[in-house]
Amino acid sequence: MGSMSEHIPATNSTGTTRVKRGLADMLKGGVIMDVVTPEQAKIAEDAGACAVMALERVPADIRAQGGVARMSDPDLIEGIIEAVSIPVMAKARIGHFVEAQVLESLRVDFIDESEVLSPADYANHIDKWAFGVPFVCGATNLGEALRRITEGAAMIRSKGEAGTGDVSEAVRHLRTIRAEMARLSSMSPDELYVAAKELQAPYDLVAEVARTGELPVVLFVAGGVATPADAALVMQMGAQGVFVGSGIFKSGNPAARAAAIVKATTAYDDPDTIAEVSRGLGEAMVGINVADVPAPHRLAERGW
């Protein structure tokens, strides 16, 4: 495991880094689906989802309706936990450590400190070491990813642009993170000090990424994945799994699309399988071109 956090003793209330990252590792190669009801959670589980994300409104609805988006009602989260046997994640606002405390008390399996909700703190993210439950956080570049890992994140996902059905931002973020990791791998030790300063991340963590060529945690992709081909695209580009939000339950045939995206994520390098599972899925979500989203409404720009 990485050198970060080795100094933090494990207590009854704090899961060790090894355990938290190991839990995230078990989701590798899978699809995590946004669900708003226990019925949707069952559809996701039956389709082969490796986990579900419990929330009141999918990102497309949050985007359309506006207003302040907060943590979901505990009754909704508990209903989804009771409905399925796979891990259940839930979202807390950036910096809102009390929402995270509530989610931990509800016994969710992962907390997503998410830019999809309205940020609670525009300067600080949650201190994730203080929790026993593992956190997943979004990143648009390597510096952001390393800062979240420094704060205790056990899984990183690209932010993409949630609720659009446009995969281009997720692709850009994944390419950026992977290109920046490759760049570190070719640097000499003295150059890594400057790189750490530029990335605003600890030198030890930067040196570890330079040595391994990978993040010390699992890297998933989120934001705009709407079709089996989208899922296979990001997997071929080096993602270790996929989050699908609005793309499934905003489409014409959610059960079929969910199963197809799971199959395409597993067989991501087999075009014949992807072609087969892409047939007859009905209407995809309508979607919004990211270029048409004005800067103040871009969710990926939340987080620092």
From Swiss-Prot:
D-glyceraldehyde 3-phosphate binds at residue 175. The keyword Zinc does not apply. Pathway: Cofactor biosynthesis; pyridoxal 5'-phosphate biosynthesis. Its EC number is 4.3.3.6. The active site is at 91 (schiff-base intermediate with d-ribose 5-phosphate). PROSITE patterns: PDXS_SNZ_1, PDXS_SNZ_2. Catalyzes the formation of pyridoxal 5'-phosphate from ribose 5-phosphate (RBP), glyceraldehyde 3-phosphate (G3P) and ammonia. The ammonia is provided by the PdxT subunit. Can also use ribulose 5-phosphate and dihydroxyacetone phosphate as substrates, resulting from enzyme-catalyzed isomerization of RBP and G3P, respectively. In the presence of PdxT, forms a dodecamer of heterodimers. This is Pyridoxal 5'-phosphate synthase subunit PdxS.
